Amino acid sequence: MIELDFVDDGAIACATLKRPPANAFTADGLRQLQETVGALNANPRVRALVITGDGPKFFSAGADLNTFADGDPAVARAMATRFGSAFEALSDARFVTIAAINGYAMGGGLECALACDLRIAETHAQMALPEPSVGLLPCGLGTQTLPWLVGEGWAKKIILAGVRVDAATALRIGLVEDVVDTGAARDAALALARNVARQSPHAVAYSKELIGLARRGVPRSAALAVERERFVDLFDTSDPREGVAAFLGKRAPQWHTDGEQDR
């Protein structure tokens, strides 16, 4: 289900969700997503991951509902574990993750986008968590990630009342960061990923970790202590020296990743 390619000398990975007609997730597809993120985590050259759907209509329609047709609790538990594990891996990735929402992002498809750091939607995109309408609930982090982005009220409208959100509304409520023309989400996400790749790799990784502390409700005093430690930790790398030297020398910095030798 995951079609992977790389651009910019491997700095940016592009994962396409490809399972016609609606790019719906199966257990195997979720396992593949988790394994893909794990492999990219082990590749220090990768600075960002762009995820999009194959075709012009669907980012992903979420779970294949045929999986739950028999009402088997064992299947439900296995799939909930798969969804949770895959999207937790995506959320906790070392690199920056960007969802290029090229169409419908429904149920687990929207949860996949919610697990990413940033989201860009095309003007025709539609987003929803309609699981309660078929007797299910979001089990891929959605009940936790959505309120963080849009607040409790909108999260309840989307989940409890089954409200579908268009791209303009998603931008207004903070569900996505940008809205672009039809067919332009992947290129816009790549442009944002290139911005990420120009930053210090260690500073970005530490900053992502620190923002995650706020999201998880870590007490402010504890999070600020970690913030100070991570600032000092940067000086165990070459990034501060290179960054300041590049700024003063009016040139682009040449960053080193953990897989390369620091100066």
Residue ranges, per PLM feature:
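Alpha-helix N-cap/N′ positions at the starts of helices
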Residues: 63, 150, 171, 223-226
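C-terminal alpha-helix plus adjacent terminal tail
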Residues: 1-12, 44, 56, 162-168, ...
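Crotonase-fold acyl-CoA enzyme core
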Residues: 89-204, 233, 237-238, 242-245, ...
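Terminal peptide-recognition signature
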Residues: 15, 33, 51, 64, ...
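Conserved CoA-thioester-binding segment of acyl-CoA-metabolizing enzymes
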Residues: 1-52, 88
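Glycine- (often His-adjacent) and acidic-residue-rich active-site loop
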Residues: 31-32, 53-89, 105, 133-135, ...
